[in-house]
Amino acid sequence: MVNRPPNSSLPTTSAVVKNDTDIPTTPKPTQTSGKDIKQPLLNGNYFKIFHQNIRSLREKHQELLSHLFPNLPHVLCFTEHHLKAFELQNINIDHYTLGAQFCRTSHAQGGVVIYTHNSLHSTTINLSKFCAEKDIEICAVKLEVQSSVFCIITAYRSPSGKFNHFLETIDAVLQSVYSPSLGIIICGDININYLVINEQRKQLDNLLLLYNLVGVADFPTRLTNTSTTAIDNVFIDVSGFYDYVVTPFPNGLSDHDTQILAFRAWYPGQSPGTKFVR
């Protein structure tokens, strides 16, 4: 067992910037269009991570690239890819390499996968021993970008998944990978609605705060005729990421909208004069 980082009280935010003119704050989803949402991400100095519950990656990956091109994210994270392992091996996404995956063997659908841009060097972190179908499906990669090292984790919990098992396993995963010099990013569909305060959200927030991680997506990610929820999220250490923004990116490929995290730099264990902006 490793020691967790000291707990700190951090506000839940949409963006953190060094000054008010560096980067726009997260736009409200009711006031943005797909074109508007892309604007903060066009600066080549940003490192971009994409997550979507894709509800089957089969026959969607080429259309997905057409939505993103030419401003391709550095990392693509998918939950519910719905593919078997051999099928996933046959999915080729131009400009990307398969970095890590989990595929179900006992149940249909589900699964998580991470692709990294061909310009990056990534290492797979083997989390297979932590996976339990429906309760927690998880995979991770480690990336070295200039002088920074990141661990990107993608997680899925089914609506019928056991929450306590999910919570205990996330804790175990974070204990296994945590390092003060490592920038940890968790993205995924955890089926906890972050538009409301509920007991499951409180328990997850309290656990993640032990690792200085907070959810930064405060906009709806799934809209139906009867509900509006934010069951997909991105969790980061807001004290270490410099000039970050997280935005929705509707593309019509799923009933879940994309979240795109973009940031300029990571400062391990410090906050470089940052200012929180809601």
Name every feature range the model reports, one short phrase each:
Residues 127, 190-191, 214-226, 246-250:
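Acidic carboxylate-rich catalytic motifs and surrounding loops in phosphoryl-/glycosyl-chemistry enzymes
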Residues 53, 80, 188-189, 256:
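Active-site glycine-centered loops adjacent to acidic/histidine catalytic or metal-binding residues
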Residues 50, 56, 216, 248, ...:
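Nucleic-acid-interacting cores, centered on viral/eukaryotic replication and modification enzymes
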Residues 109-112, 135-140, 229-233, 255-260:
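Short hydrophobic/aromatic beta-strand or adjacent loop that forms the aromatic wall/cage
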Residues 76-79, 185-189, 214-220, 235:
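Active-site neighborhood of phospho(di)ester-bond hydrolases with catalytic His/Asp-centered motifs
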Residues 35, 150-155, 183-199, 262, ...:
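Arg/Lys-enriched, amphipathic patches
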Residues 1-181, 194-196, 202-213:
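Short phosphate/oxyanion-binding micro-motifs
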Residues 16, 142-150, 238-278:
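Surface polyanion/phosphate-binding segment centered on an Asp-His-Pro turn
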